[in-house]
């Protein structure tokens, strides 16, 4: 699924680096590779979930925009706003994701 999403975003003009888990993402961020947006599922393989990944990533790159994905209805928008991110609910269509990625990239960091 991860690679399908990455391919869909690439076909819509986005530059995408897809990694298998949060640990790898953090390793890349610690190498001071600059990213505009972190798109992460809240529930992921490995020890670190999407919330913790975003928190650590923001400490490394304070201007990084965050877009969370979840299939769980109990995740509130208020929780996401508190963590300075945006949320897309699964399942989503590729065009919906592209729209949300654009919105997140264009946001000024204020709550939506």
Name these PLM-found stretches.
Residues 30-33, 56-64, 76-83, 103:
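Conserved phosphotransfer cores of two-component systems
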Residues 13-20, 28:
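Short hydrophobic/Thr-rich beta-strand motif most characteristic of the beta2 strand and flanking loop
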Residues 23-30, 98:
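Alpha2 helix of the CheY-like receiver
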Residues 41-42:
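Active-site residues of response regulator receiver
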Residues 67-69:
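Hydrophobic/aromatic residues positioned on beta-strands within the core alpha/beta folds
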Residues 3-11:
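Charged docking surfaces used in two-component/phosphorelay signaling
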Residues 21-24, 48-53:
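Acidic catalytic/metal-coordinating carboxylates
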Residues 92-105, 109:
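C-terminal output helix
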